[in-house]
Amino acid sequence: MIIHSLLDTDLYKFTMMQAVLHQHPAAQVDYRFKCRTPGVDLAQFIDEISREIDALCRLRLREDEVDYLRSLRFIKPDFADFLALFHLDRKYLTLAASAAHPGEIELTIRGPWLHTILFEVPLLAIINEVWFRNTSEPDFEEGRSRLREKVRSLRSMPAGCKIADYGTRRRYSRQWHGELLPLLRDGLGEQFVGTSNVFFAKQYGLTPLGTMAHEYLQAFQALGPRLRDSQVAALDSWAREYRGDLGIALSDVVGLDAFLRDFDLYFCKLFDGMRHDSGDPFEWGERVIAHLEAHRVDPRTKVLVFSDGLNIDKVMRLYEHFSPRCRLAFGVGTSLTNDLGPTPLQIVIKMVRCNGQPVAKLSDSPGKSMCEDLGYLRYLRDVFGLPPMPEAGDPARQ
């Protein structure tokens, strides 16, 4: 059994889930799985994946786990009570081998947002671990050696250069994830600020980290009053839920240009900072700093969070570039939790519909966008003033 606890997920799944419970408990959503790594035959392991999903759906939170969530200042009593009764229901999930694309799997989640939001991260962790335990021999000593070198590199930086673990969804295995976190904690001291994984935060006395994911802002494309106002509606909703807590806004759901147009003086003052998850991080940071300064907000009072495909070298370069002009945070994922030699899988589960309407992410990085409805993509780009989609046959179209 790969997943032993419903806490073995990212914190932002719980923080978004709480907002859904309080504000949109009736919302219905669709998610789709996609493997971006070519030539990966996951279909051969579909029975093993299915058994792991069955085990996941039998899990409930233990009393001590619910008590841990209650201890977090932003978790409200009614949500903790709800989680004490919660379990994932297999009826909302379909898994089959793809008839159109041999070797691929078709994984769909469809149902109430409140009851399906916790599927994504453990499903990705399951698929990763099933793949790697069947296709590679783990070289944990090589992984430990690489980890020690990363610790040495980071220790050579100023004490303000700090990282967090964001690697649950693409980890090599649960065992390796559990081993590396205390190594980072003990090796880096205050330069290791915590983990997005709630289970391991509880187990190792680490700070659980996270705010919102793309799906939260995507859903408001169907939940908000107007499509053009969907980002503003999502950020307002978040502010109502958390009243100044968990104040990191995600900037790339419909691209940085559109985000900055919506992130006005009110949001610049209200939120603690912004998170980068696609596009050139150096260009992004410069534009965010300039945006804050244009609104007479001192960037040194705000946090820029970087979380897109980071490794330790990139962390150090970003820190040297932006410090001390702003506060900095770095969430490192695959480079920490899946660096034992085998090539990591590029797999995602993304929301594609909400209340029967298509929703989409228009990433600042080519290839990271995902939507089933090309007509909606064209409309979304037009509404937010983005360049038209490339014509059929243009490599950029893919």
UniProtKB/Swiss-Prot annotation:
Enzyme class: ligase
Pfam families: NAPRTase, NAPRTase_N
Swiss-Prot/TrEMBL keywords: Ligase, Phosphoprotein, Pyridine nucleotide biosynthesis
GO terms of molecular function: nicotinate phosphoribosyltransferase activity
Keyword flag Ligase: yes
Modification Phosphohistidine occurs at: 214
EC number of this enzyme: 6.3.4.21
Gene Ontology, cellular component aspect: cytosol
Free-text function comment from the UniProt entry: Catalyzes the synthesis of beta-nicotinate D-ribonucleotide from nicotinate and 5-phospho-D-ribose 1-phosphate at the expense of ATP.
Name assigned to this protein: Nicotinate phosphoribosyltransferase
Protein's organism: Xanthomonas campestris pv. campestris (strain B100)
Species lineage: Bacteria, Pseudomonadati, Pseudomonadota, Gammaproteobacteria, Lysobacterales
